[in-house]
Amino acid sequence: MPSLESADKLSNKLAAIGNITSDGRPILGLDCEHLLEMVLEADERGVLIPAHIWTPWFSLFGSKSGFDALEDCFGSLSSHIFALETGLSSDPDMNRLWSALDRYALVSNSDAHSGENLGREANLFEGTPSYDGIFDA
């Protein structure tokens, strides 16, 4: 979110729906299109980047997600998705084999869930260290 105020606004909306403090992974009973709608209502400059898109079960492209395409997940708001976070279940070369991902910026992160892979992937930005600077990079 572009500001602390808009982040608080979104946080309050999400807290009214479900548990956002459980263990770092909010438990919400809403679909992805509605979540993105809430992000954009909190601030029109807000961004949602689907994360861990290749996690095998319930990720965007997981076998249990029910989605065959990003558009199935985000519906009429799909055009607001410009980047995807690949997660540790893939690698950059694998991601570029699927041409449907060519129109998205791909970001990769490592996290404490997989200690042996910590730091395996990272994002490097050149430019001003600010919210807008990320998008200008």
What are these regions (language model features)?
Residues 1-23, 37, 56-137:
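Charged catalytic cores and adjacent phosphate/nucleic-acid-binding surfaces used
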Residues 36-43:
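Active-site acidic/histidine clusters and adjacent loop/turn architecture
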Residues 31-35:
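Alpha-helical packing segments of well-folded alpha/beta enzyme cores
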Residues 43-44, 103:
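Residue-level detector of structured alpha->beta connecting loops
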Residues 16, 47-49:
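Divalent metal-dependent hydrolysis catalytic cores, especially in the metallo-beta-lactamase
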Residues 50-54:
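Short, well-ordered beta-to-alpha junction loops that form the rim of enzyme active sites
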Residues 25-30:
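Active-site glycine- and acidic-residue-rich loops that bind
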